[in-house]
Amino acid sequence: MELEIALMLRPEAGALISGGKGLRKIRRPLSGRGKSGGARVIYYYISNNATIYLVFAYAKNRQPDLTKDQLATLTKFVASQIS
């Protein structure tokens, strides 16, 4: 619930992902790890109707960043949902 509230208050807080066609990434702490070793949440924000799609999350210790294939899949998924 903390994440949802944080994004409602500051929906553009996450960094835009290069090549992500509007996808954003925000860091969130995991229990006992802090932000840098925590989770990454990928989301898409549509400002004209204040809609936020949470599309993917992962622990940084399992994967440092999205792969090119994952990014391509996520951008296609978002495009199919908002068209």
Kindly give the residue locations of the regions a language model identified.
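Basic, Lys/Arg-enriched alpha-helical interface segments
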Residues: 1-35, 48-49, 59, 63-83
